[in-house]
């Protein structure tokens, strides 16, 4: 089946701009830390709520060429970039394997979308852009065989973790969410090890969050990891990791001395 591409980046940007809200813009700029020296310094907002952006994505999904998506994620506007990245999520969803269908063409498309995302990963330059997209793009890609039958190289997570870019480092950690949900913890624990000593709070939170997700699937795995690593963790990482434990158990971890 041939896809007819009906929407351009300009069409989508116009639809988003028609909903811009100055009051909401100011609130978002504060929330996403766009001030001088903050992690979101210089980012620009139209003032859209996430459901508004998703509404546009639902309207145009499957009918936007990757070349137009590339223009969206190059935009200076946060919501336009988000829209572009969410369109990649939708494209990945369309080619996920099912019990009845998993063609070489679908596998090739998954690889194309993942590679596209990796080339533009630094444009996912705030935590929401990372968290809403990387598990459903890179995470899904890493779960399934490529067209030649081999599995994608999960060493990409290590390379992202070793990047000098904060957002690529967060991608390295948060991508594991999809793997964790499928009972695969090894990569998450390995990347957590790489990032435990990271200086930034956004990485402390990401590592703790993924450890918490491991615990939701298998508490014994989380507890074993904490026994070995809690003394090396930032306090924020530990608090996030143990958040879903019972209160007595949580307090016991918090009272431990390194």
Where are these regions (language model features)?
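Alpha-helical scaffold domains
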Residues: 1-258
């Amino acid at each position: 089946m041939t896809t007819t591409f009906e929407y351009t980046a300009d069409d989508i940007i116009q639809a988003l701009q028609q909903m811009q809200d100055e009051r909401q813009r100011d609130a978002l700029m504060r929330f996403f830390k766009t001030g001088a020296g903050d992690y979101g310094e210089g980012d620009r907002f139209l003032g859209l709520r996430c459901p508004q952006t998703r509404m546009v994505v639902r309207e145009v999904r499957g009918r936007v060429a990757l070349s137009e998506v590339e223009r969206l994620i190059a935009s200076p506007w946060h919501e336009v970039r988000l829209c572009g990245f969410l369109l990649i999520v939708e494209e990945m969803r369309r080619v996920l394997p099912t019990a009845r269908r998993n063609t070489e063409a679908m596998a090739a498309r998954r690889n194309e979308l993942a590679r596209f995302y990796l080339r533009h990963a630094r444009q996912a330059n705030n935590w929401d852009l990372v968290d809403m997209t990387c598990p459903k793009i890179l995470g899904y890609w890493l779960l399934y065989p490529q067209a030649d039958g081999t599995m994608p190289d999960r060493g990409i997570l290590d390379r992202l973790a070793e990047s000098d870019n904060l957002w690529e480092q967060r991608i390295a950690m948060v991508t594991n969410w999809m793997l964790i949900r499928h009972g695969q913890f090894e990569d998450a624990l390995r990347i957590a090890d790489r990032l435990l000593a990271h200086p930034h709070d956004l990485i402390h939170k990401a590592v703790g969050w993924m450890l918490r997700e491991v615990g939701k699937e298998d508490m014994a795995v989380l507890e074993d990891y904490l026994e070995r690593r809690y003394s090396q963790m930032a306090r924020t990482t530990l608090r996030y990791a143990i958040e879903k434990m019972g209160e007595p158990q949580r307090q016991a971890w918090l009272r431990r001395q390194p």
